Amino acid sequence: MQAFEPLMPKGASIINLSSLAARDGGGGGSALYASSKGAVTTFTRAMAKELGPKGIRVNALCPGLIGTKFHDDFTKDEVRTIVAGKTPVRREGRADEVADLVLYLASDKSSFVTGANFDINGGLAFS
């Protein structure tokens, strides 16, 4: 980020992608993935502190189970059903719902929001 920070105008917004796995460790065999996403959440907070005085906001999304091609290809249907059933909203998230949050964070409507890691998981886990 430091390499392109001088090119970013005041009021710019950086949106990182983390994961619910950053907090709960992910599923079996995903220790490295979960650890890397944990680093993203901490990096987001650190960069928010560094870049905030320059007028640049930094936030991250921490999605849970979002219906994507990745899950179509690599997550068993029965696992998806179980996880979706554990959310208070009783379903998987959709990519367009994640995109809506990205649009909000990129807009001036979120001009006082920085250093936040947003859970977008249907209530499966709360911050």
Where is each model-derived feature located?
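Active-site helix of classical SDR
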Residues: 1, 36, 44
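Alpha-helical segment proximal to the catalytic Tyr-Lys
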Residues: 6, 49-53, 111
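Residue(s) in the substrate-gating loop at a strand-loop-helix junction
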Residues: 19
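Short, flexible catalytic-loop segment of classical short-chain dehydrogenase/reductase
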Residues: 23, 62-73
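Active-site loop-to-helix junction immediately N-terminal to the catalytic Tyr of the SDR YXXXK motif
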Residues: 25-34, 46
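Hydrophobic alpha-helix immediately C-terminal to the catalytic Tyr-X-X-X-Lys motif of short-chain
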Residues: 39, 43-47, 51, 61, ...
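A conserved structural motif in NAD(P)-dependent oxidoreductases
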Residues: 87-98
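Short C-terminal tail/terminal secondary-structure segment
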Residues: 103, 114-127
